[in-house]
Amino acid sequence: FLVDAGKATTMADVFKKYLARGKTGYVPPQWCTIKQAIDVIHHSGGKAVLAHPGRYNLSAKWLKRLLAHFAECGGEAMEVAQCQQAPNERAQLATYARQYGLLGSQGSDFHQPCAWIELGRKLWLPAGVEPVWQLWEQPQQIEEREV
């Protein structure tokens, strides 16, 4: 909207001018705990998946702590595969998924069309990583009846 209205030139400009700390539209984040988030997801019938853990800019030590805590709190899966990802990152995330007993998911982290996101491409789970969708309930077959 702000770009269309001429108040900013790009989405990055919107964040810089209006949504950054100290700017008019900034709202300080109010975070829940990982346990609270997982409980809400479970209460609503969902499966808790840790999204794009390779993008949190954490050291291996802190990423392992996050994954261990996530699993201890009842998280079921972690994103292992992304379309824009180095092969060694996918292999490392697969190792972590197996190490912490987490299922795998795949995703593009797609927010809007752009040239560098290949939506749905190069998404595969490495061997030994079970997919989170194996937990999804399958719809029941409804028998046809004569009326």
What is each residue range found by the language model?
Residues 1-17:
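Extended, charge-rich helix/loop segments that form flexible
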Residues 3, 29-33:
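Short, charged low-complexity intrinsically disordered segments located at boundaries
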Residues 9, 32, 36-50, 54-147:
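Charged catalytic cores and adjacent phosphate/nucleic-acid-binding surfaces used
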Residues 16-28:
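Surface-exposed cleft-lining segments at the edges of enzyme active sites
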